[in-house]
């Protein structure tokens, strides 16, 4: 009896295996961290073999601790840190260099050169992205240009490229399936999101041979099976793949046009489903593919906030204002307001809609009466203001007014933050019972492909709300507070 779906969530700092049942509930999970490599300032790399080892380890731990047999698994879904690039030898199956992580800035110079050559507009039109070291394309070029003999091997068809999903499917299937899904392909800077093909003009710009690239498939489909020696003698269908933020949008059941979710992790990622049309952004958002399913492709607008949960960690570890992140809510609730204090947590620059990597964090409105409580509250409020910045851009680009915002991620446990978020946006904020929406989204995609769940309507009914936060703040007050934030942003940008 096929009782479960196994979701593999390969993140930036750890790998997780999560078993879900028919109701979309977590049966068991296992997690394993792996090493971060920083060869030079601003560079971030992972050992792809170590990632693969961590995946095998969490699968084994999860199944044995849950006392679940491999033959009880109906299918495997994979979700992954996006943009991180792996290049490996087709014959030996070994990576020729470390995986270059999405956060890594080692290709910034390549990006500057491409911008100087005037490629920005063409890239934006075809991919919906900006030329930035964040995306996979320049990472692949860097590996081919800097690893001895790599370019020659690539030209001869001996090397393969993949984002982490591709690497894991390739390994699980014993090298039989070299595939990715639409959502991951749309983050590479090499994929045309309108005609759904690898784009020759983009590949020429990056000097990447087409033979390296995986086949692009829908996000919910059987791509292959596990090879028995990697999966306890069983051939289990590998049936769903999506990048982490898109998987969270699916896990939140944001299937309708205009539905949006915000994930509060280290940073924040807000995605709005724009249906079957790619909406070009005039306000600093990315246009991306949400997923491909049932012969259709859904698009999304995406906003990135670089610092969110990490600002709370900074209060805890850097400023030593409390011992546990949950205490931030207690302190923030002790004061009626920030008393005019604003914190702009631009520790690594500002993301959407400003895209300014030069600015740094700042604090405004401090008086002799400012206390620790004001400071903590102002830092928490900054997450809500940044989210409003992104939402304003989304509404302007899409022409869609948001009805409710679904939220997930570590910081959503903070009731003060969620209530303030609702007040500042003037829309209800909904927190689900199951917060593991990324892994759940991948499980749903896999389950649909193997018939474990019938359709998206069945999934929609499984979304249950833990708490709904309604806006109660006077419009005049919230507008005044937000105007103060915009002033703080301008002042921060002026100080460089």
Curated annotation (Swiss-Prot):
Biological or metabolic pathway of the protein: Polyol metabolism; glycerol degradation via glycerol kinase pathway; sn-glycerol 3-phosphate from glycerol: step 1/1
Binding residue positions for ATP: 12-14, 266, 309, 313, 410
One BP annotation, GO: glycerol-3-phosphate metabolic process
Binding site for sn-glycerol 3-phosphate: 12, 82-83, 134, 244
Highest taxon of the lineage: Bacteria
Catalytic function, reaction form: glycerol + ATP = sn-glycerol 3-phosphate + ADP + H(+)
Residues the record lists as Phosphohistidine modifications: 230
Regulation: Activated by phosphorylation and inhibited by fructose 1,6-bisphosphate (FBP).
UniProt-listed Pfam families: FGGY_C, FGGY_N
PTM comment: The phosphoenolpyruvate-dependent sugar phosphotransferase system (PTS), including enzyme I, and histidine-containing protein (HPr) are required for the phosphorylation, which leads to the activation of the enzyme.
One function term, GO molecular function aspect: glycerol kinase activity
Entry keyword set: ATP-binding, Glycerol metabolism, Kinase, Nucleotide-binding, Phosphoprotein, Transferase
Root EC class: transferase
UniProt-listed Enzyme Commission number(s): 2.7.1.30
Binding site for glycerol: 82-83, 134, 244-245
One Gene Ontology cellular component: cytosol
Binding sites annotated in the UniProt record for ADP: 12, 16, 266, 309, 410, 414
Oligomeric form and interacting partners: Homotetramer and homodimer (in equilibrium).
Family per similarity comment: Belongs to the FGGY kinase family.
PANTHER family linked to this entry: GLYCEROL KINASE, SUGAR KINASE
Protein function: Key enzyme in the regulation of glycerol uptake and metabolism. Catalyzes the phosphorylation of glycerol to yield sn-glycerol 3-phosphate.
Protein name: Glycerol kinase
Gene giving rise to this polypeptide: glpK
């Amino acid at each position: 009896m096929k009782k479960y779906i196994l979701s593999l969530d390969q993140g930036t700092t750890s790998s997780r295996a999560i078993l879900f049942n028919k109701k979309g509930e977590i049966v068991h999970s296992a997690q394993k961290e792996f090493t971060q490599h920083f060869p030079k300032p601003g560079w971030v790399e992972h050992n792809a073999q170590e990632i693969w080892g961590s995946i095998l380890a969490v699968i084994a731990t999860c199944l044995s601790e849950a006392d679940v047999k491999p033959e009880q698994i109906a299918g495997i879904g994979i979700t992954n840190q996006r943009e991180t690039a792996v290049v490996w030898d087709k014959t030996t199956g070994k990576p020729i260099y470390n995986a270059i992580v999405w956060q890594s800035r080692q290709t910034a110079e390549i990006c500057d050169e491409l911008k100087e050559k005037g490629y920005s507009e063409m890239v934006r039109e075809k991919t919906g992205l900006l030329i930035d070291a964040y995306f996979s394309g320049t990472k692949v070029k860097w590996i081919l240009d800097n690893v001895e003999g790599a370019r020659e091997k690539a030209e001869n068809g001996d090397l393969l490229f993949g984002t982490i999903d591709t690497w894991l499917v390739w390994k699980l299937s014993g090298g039989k399936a070299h595939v990715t899904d639409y959502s991951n392909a749309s983050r590479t800077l090499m994929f045309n999101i309108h005609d759904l093909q690898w784009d020759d003009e983009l590949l020429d710009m990056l000097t990447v041979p087409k033979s390296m690239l995986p086949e692009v498939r829908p996000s919910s489909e059987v791509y292959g099976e596990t090879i028995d020696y990697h999966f306890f003698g069983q051939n289990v269908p590998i049936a769903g793949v999506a990048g982490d933020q898109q998987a969270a949008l699916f896990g939140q059941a944001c299937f309708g046009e205009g539905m949006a979710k915000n994930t509060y992790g280290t940073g924040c990622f807000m995605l709005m489903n724009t249906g079957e049309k790619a909406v070009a952004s005039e306000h600093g958002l990315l246009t991306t593919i949400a997923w491909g399913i049932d012969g259709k492709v859904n698009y999304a607008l995406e906003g990135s906030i670089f610092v969110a949960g990490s600002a709370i960690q900074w209060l805890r570890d850097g400023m030593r204002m409390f011992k546990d992140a949950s205490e931030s809510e207690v302190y923030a609730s002790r004061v009626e307001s920030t008393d005019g204090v604003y914190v702009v947590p631009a520790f690594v620059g500002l993301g959407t809609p400003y895209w300014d990597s030069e600015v740094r964090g700042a604090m405004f409105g401090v008086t002799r009466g400012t206390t620790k409580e004001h400071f903590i509250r102002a830092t928490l409020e900054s997450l809500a203001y940044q989210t409003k910045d992104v939402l304003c851009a989304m509404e302007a680009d899409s022409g869609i007014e948001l009805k409710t915002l679904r939220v997930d991620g570590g910081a959503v446990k903070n009731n003060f933050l969620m209530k303030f978020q609702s007040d500042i946006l003037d829309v209800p904020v909904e927190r689900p019972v199951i917060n593991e929406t990324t892994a759940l989204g991948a499980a749903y995609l896999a389950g649909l492909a193997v018939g474990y769940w019938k359709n998206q309507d069945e999934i929609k009914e499984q979304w249950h709300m833990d708490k709904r936060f309604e806006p109660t703040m006077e419009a005049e007050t919230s507008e005044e507070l937000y105007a103060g934030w915009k002033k703080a942003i301008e002042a921060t940008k002026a100080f460089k």
